[in-house]
Amino acid sequence: LVQSDNANLLVDVGLGCRATLSALKMYNLSLSDITAIVVTHEHSDHIGGISSFVSHSPVPVYAPKAIANLVAKRATCCDVSGIADATEIADLRIDRYECSHDATACYGYRFSDGTNSVATVTDTGCVTTGLVDFLAPCDRIQLESNHDVDMLKSGPYPYPLKRRILSDFGHLSNAQATQVLSDLVGSNVKSVILAHLSEHNNTAEL
Protein backbone atom coordinates (compact mmCIF):
# COMPACT_ATOMS: atom_id res chain seq x y z
CA LEU A 1 0.00 0.00 0.00
CA VAL A 2 1.37 3.41 -1.04
CA GLN A 3 -0.51 6.42 0.28
CA SER A 4 -0.36 10.12 -0.51
CA ASP A 5 -2.72 13.03 0.04
CA ASN A 6 -4.75 12.10 -3.05
CA ALA A 7 -4.07 8.43 -3.72
CA ASN A 8 -4.07 4.93 -2.25
CA LEU A 9 -2.17 2.56 -4.54
CA LEU A 10 -1.77 -1.18 -4.19
CA VAL A 11 1.42 -2.70 -5.56
CA ASP A 12 0.37 -6.17 -6.74
CA VAL A 13 -2.64 -8.09 -5.47
CA GLY A 14 -1.73 -11.72 -4.94
CA LEU A 15 -4.24 -12.46 -2.21
CA GLY A 16 -7.95 -13.05 -2.52
CA CYS A 17 -10.45 -10.26 -2.01
CA ARG A 18 -11.29 -11.24 1.57
CA ALA A 19 -7.63 -11.31 2.65
CA THR A 20 -6.92 -8.04 0.86
CA LEU A 21 -9.88 -6.36 2.53
CA SER A 22 -8.74 -7.64 5.92
CA ALA A 23 -5.30 -6.11 5.34
CA LEU A 24 -6.79 -2.80 4.20
CA LYS A 25 -8.92 -2.58 7.34
CA MET A 26 -5.69 -2.28 9.33
CA TYR A 27 -5.36 1.14 7.69
CA ASN A 28 -9.06 1.98 7.98
CA LEU A 29 -9.50 1.51 4.25
CA SER A 30 -11.96 -0.44 2.12
CA LEU A 31 -11.70 -1.70 -1.45
CA SER A 32 -13.43 1.43 -2.73
CA ASP A 33 -10.69 3.62 -1.25
CA ILE A 34 -8.07 2.20 -3.60
CA THR A 35 -7.15 4.53 -6.45
CA ALA A 36 -5.30 2.03 -8.66
CA ILE A 37 -3.34 -1.22 -8.73
CA VAL A 38 0.26 -1.21 -9.96
CA VAL A 39 1.68 -4.58 -11.08
CA THR A 40 5.37 -5.51 -10.84
CA HIS A 41 5.25 -8.69 -12.98
CA GLU A 42 2.94 -11.43 -14.17
CA HIS A 43 3.60 -14.26 -11.69
CA SER A 44 0.45 -15.57 -10.03
CA ASP A 45 1.49 -14.70 -6.48
CA HIS A 46 1.48 -11.06 -7.58
CA ILE A 47 -1.63 -10.87 -9.76
CA GLY A 48 -3.79 -13.78 -8.55
CA GLY A 49 -6.20 -11.56 -6.63
CA ILE A 50 -6.67 -8.79 -9.18
CA SER A 51 -9.66 -10.35 -10.94
CA SER A 52 -11.59 -10.72 -7.68
CA PHE A 53 -10.62 -7.22 -6.58
CA VAL A 54 -11.76 -5.42 -9.72
CA SER A 55 -14.98 -7.44 -9.84
CA HIS A 56 -15.88 -5.99 -6.44
CA SER A 57 -14.33 -2.55 -6.93
CA PRO A 58 -13.38 -1.55 -10.49
CA VAL A 59 -10.12 0.42 -10.41
CA PRO A 60 -7.47 1.17 -13.04
CA VAL A 61 -4.71 -1.44 -13.30
CA TYR A 62 -1.21 -0.52 -14.47
CA ALA A 63 1.55 -2.93 -15.50
CA PRO A 64 4.84 -2.81 -17.43
CA LYS A 65 4.03 -2.15 -21.08
CA ALA A 66 5.60 -5.43 -22.20
CA ILE A 67 3.12 -7.47 -20.15
CA ALA A 68 0.02 -5.26 -19.99
CA ASN A 69 -1.95 -7.52 -22.32
CA LEU A 70 -0.67 -10.65 -20.58
CA VAL A 71 -1.71 -9.35 -17.17
CA ALA A 72 -5.13 -8.40 -18.53
CA LYS A 73 -5.58 -11.95 -19.85
CA ARG A 74 -4.34 -13.78 -16.76
CA ALA A 75 -6.11 -11.51 -14.30
CA THR A 76 -9.21 -11.32 -16.52
CA CYS A 77 -9.21 -7.54 -16.28
CA CYS A 78 -11.00 -5.60 -18.96
CA ASP A 79 -8.12 -3.15 -19.37
CA VAL A 80 -4.54 -2.81 -18.15
CA SER A 81 -2.56 0.33 -18.92
CA GLY A 82 1.15 0.22 -19.70
CA ILE A 83 3.34 2.02 -17.22
CA ALA A 84 6.48 3.92 -18.20
CA ASP A 85 9.00 6.09 -16.39
CA ALA A 86 7.53 9.28 -14.97
CA THR A 87 3.98 7.94 -15.11
CA GLU A 88 1.68 9.97 -12.86
CA ILE A 89 -1.30 8.67 -10.91
CA ALA A 90 -3.09 11.39 -8.94
CA ASP A 91 -0.33 13.27 -7.07
CA LEU A 92 2.24 10.48 -7.35
CA ARG A 93 5.04 10.24 -9.89
CA ILE A 94 6.13 6.65 -10.56
CA ASP A 95 9.61 5.71 -11.76
CA ARG A 96 10.69 2.16 -12.62
CA TYR A 97 13.67 -0.06 -11.89
CA GLU A 98 14.15 -3.15 -14.05
CA CYS A 99 14.60 -6.25 -11.90
CA SER A 100 16.45 -9.43 -12.84
CA HIS A 101 13.77 -12.09 -12.51
CA ASP A 102 12.43 -15.01 -14.54
CA ALA A 103 9.41 -13.11 -15.74
CA THR A 104 8.59 -11.54 -19.09
CA ALA A 105 9.10 -8.14 -17.47
CA CYS A 106 9.61 -7.27 -13.81
CA TYR A 107 10.01 -3.85 -12.21
CA GLY A 108 10.47 -2.21 -8.88
CA TYR A 109 8.86 1.19 -8.42
CA ARG A 110 9.63 4.50 -6.77
CA PHE A 111 6.69 6.71 -5.79
CA SER A 112 7.17 10.44 -5.18
CA ASP A 113 4.71 13.18 -4.26
CA GLY A 114 7.22 16.02 -4.56
CA THR A 115 8.06 15.94 -0.86
CA ASN A 116 8.42 12.29 0.11
CA SER A 117 9.55 9.25 -1.82
CA VAL A 118 9.17 5.50 -1.21
CA ALA A 119 10.25 2.50 -3.26
CA THR A 120 9.59 -1.22 -3.47
CA VAL A 121 12.00 -3.67 -5.09
CA THR A 122 11.35 -7.40 -4.77
CA ASP A 123 11.74 -10.41 -7.07
CA THR A 124 15.22 -9.69 -8.35
CA GLY A 125 17.92 -12.35 -8.44
CA CYS A 126 20.90 -10.03 -8.35
CA VAL A 127 21.86 -6.47 -7.58
CA THR A 128 21.95 -4.89 -11.01
CA THR A 129 23.53 -1.58 -11.95
CA GLY A 130 21.71 1.42 -10.59
CA LEU A 131 19.77 -0.19 -7.74
CA VAL A 132 21.47 1.79 -4.98
CA ASP A 133 21.08 5.04 -6.94
CA PHE A 134 17.40 4.22 -7.51
CA LEU A 135 16.77 3.68 -3.79
CA ALA A 136 19.03 6.38 -2.34
CA PRO A 137 16.64 9.37 -2.70
CA CYS A 138 13.83 7.56 -0.88
CA ASP A 139 12.66 8.18 2.67
CA ARG A 140 11.46 4.58 3.01
CA ILE A 141 12.18 1.44 1.01
CA GLN A 142 10.80 -2.08 0.80
CA LEU A 143 13.54 -4.48 -0.26
CA GLU A 144 13.54 -8.20 -0.91
CA SER A 145 15.42 -10.38 1.58
CA ASN A 146 14.11 -13.75 0.48
CA HIS A 147 16.35 -16.46 1.86
CA ASP A 148 19.34 -17.55 3.86
CA VAL A 149 21.59 -19.37 1.40
CA ASP A 150 22.59 -22.15 3.81
CA MET A 151 18.97 -22.78 4.83
CA LEU A 152 17.93 -22.94 1.19
CA LYS A 153 20.72 -25.31 0.19
CA SER A 154 20.01 -27.71 3.06
CA GLY A 155 16.23 -27.32 2.93
CA PRO A 156 13.45 -29.46 1.44
CA TYR A 157 13.08 -27.74 -1.94
CA PRO A 158 13.87 -29.85 -5.03
CA TYR A 159 17.20 -29.05 -6.66
CA PRO A 160 15.77 -27.30 -9.76
CA LEU A 161 13.82 -24.89 -7.53
CA LYS A 162 16.88 -24.21 -5.38
CA ARG A 163 18.90 -23.49 -8.50
CA ARG A 164 16.22 -21.11 -9.79
CA ILE A 165 16.05 -19.16 -6.51
CA LEU A 166 19.84 -18.89 -6.27
CA SER A 167 20.25 -17.79 -9.88
CA ASP A 168 20.60 -14.23 -11.13
CA PHE A 169 16.93 -14.46 -12.15
CA GLY A 170 15.62 -15.69 -8.79
CA HIS A 171 15.46 -13.84 -5.49
CA LEU A 172 17.76 -11.72 -3.32
CA SER A 173 19.37 -13.49 -0.39
CA ASN A 174 19.77 -11.96 3.06
CA ALA A 175 23.45 -11.35 2.31
CA GLN A 176 22.67 -9.54 -0.94
CA ALA A 177 20.06 -7.37 0.76
CA THR A 178 22.55 -6.57 3.52
CA GLN A 179 25.07 -5.40 0.95
CA VAL A 180 22.51 -3.08 -0.65
CA LEU A 181 21.62 -1.60 2.73
CA SER A 182 25.31 -1.14 3.55
CA ASP A 183 25.74 0.77 0.30
CA LEU A 184 22.79 2.99 1.26
CA VAL A 185 24.39 4.16 4.51
CA GLY A 186 24.59 7.95 4.32
CA SER A 187 21.75 8.19 1.78
CA ASN A 188 18.32 9.70 2.36
CA VAL A 189 16.81 6.34 3.39
CA LYS A 190 15.44 6.46 6.94
CA SER A 191 13.30 3.32 7.11
CA VAL A 192 13.55 -0.17 5.60
CA ILE A 193 10.96 -2.92 5.27
CA LEU A 194 12.36 -6.34 4.37
CA ALA A 195 9.97 -8.23 2.11
CA HIS A 196 9.33 -11.51 0.31
CA LEU A 197 10.82 -13.53 3.19
CA SER A 198 10.64 -17.25 2.51
CA GLU A 199 8.57 -19.29 4.96
CA HIS A 200 10.91 -22.27 4.57
CA ASN A 201 14.34 -20.75 3.96
CA ASN A 202 14.45 -17.72 6.24
CA THR A 203 13.49 -16.43 9.66
CA ALA A 204 12.65 -12.97 10.93
CA GLU A 205 15.57 -13.25 13.37
CA LEU A 206 18.05 -13.77 10.53
Model features per residue range: what roles?
Residues 7, 57-60, 186-190:
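A short helix->loop->beta-strand "cap" motif at the edges of active sites that frequently abuts
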Residues 11-14, 34-42, 62-65, 119-123, ...:
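Active-site neighborhood of phospho(di)ester-bond hydrolases with catalytic His/Asp-centered motifs
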Residues 48-57, 72-74, 202-206:
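Metal-dependent catalytic neighborhoods of phosphoester/phosphodiester hydrolases
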Residues 63-116:
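Metallo-beta-lactamase
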Residues 129-206:
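Cap/insert and terminal regions of metallo-dependent hydrolase folds
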